[in-house]
Amino acid sequence: MKKTALLAALCSVVSLSSCCRIVDCCFEDPCAPIKCSPCESKKREVNGGCNSCNGYVPSCKPCGGELDHETKQGPQARGIQADGRCRQ
C-alpha cells in the first residue's frame, strides 16, 4: 500500500513538471511546431507521459532562421509576424 501511494505521488509530481514544460515550450515559444499540442502529448503517453511536447526543445533563434533581428523590435525580433503568427 505504501509503495502504491509513493508511486502515485511520484507520478503526480512528474506529471506536474511535465505540464509546466509543455506550457513553456508550446505556449511561450511562438516558434513551437503545430504538432506540439499538450493534449496530443498526454494522449500518446510517451515514456510514461514524461516526454513533454514529443521531445521538442524551444530554439533561441527567430523562425525562418533570420539573424538580422537587431533592426527589429518587440515580437518581430523573435520571428513573430505582426498578426501574431510564427514566420515559417
Curated annotation (Swiss-Prot):
The keyword Oxidoreductase does not apply. A lipid is attached at C19 (S-diacylglycerol cysteine). One of its GO terms (molecular function) is extracellular matrix structural constituent. It is found in: Cell outer membrane. GO terms for biological process: regulation of cell shape. It comes from the Bacteria. Residues 1-18 form the signal peptide. It is a lipid-anchor. A lipid is attached at C19 (N-palmitoyl cysteine). GO terms for cellular component: cell outer membrane. Keywords: Cell outer membrane, Cell shape, Disulfide bond, Lipoprotein, Membrane, Palmitate, Signal. Pfam families: Chlam_OMP3. In elementary bodies (EBs, the infectious stage, which is able to survive outside the host cell) provides the structural integrity of the outer envelope through disulfide cross-links with the large cysteine-rich periplasmic protein and the major outer membrane porin. It has been described in publications as the Sarkosyl-insoluble COMC (Chlamydia outer membrane complex), and serves as the functional equivalent of peptidoglycan. Part of a disulfide cross-linked outer membrane complex (COMC) composed of the major outer membrane porin (MOMP), the small cysteine-rich protein (OmcA) and the large cysteine-rich periplasmic protein (OmcB). This is Small cysteine-rich outer membrane protein OmcA. It comes from Chlamydia muridarum (strain MoPn / Nigg). The gene is omcA.
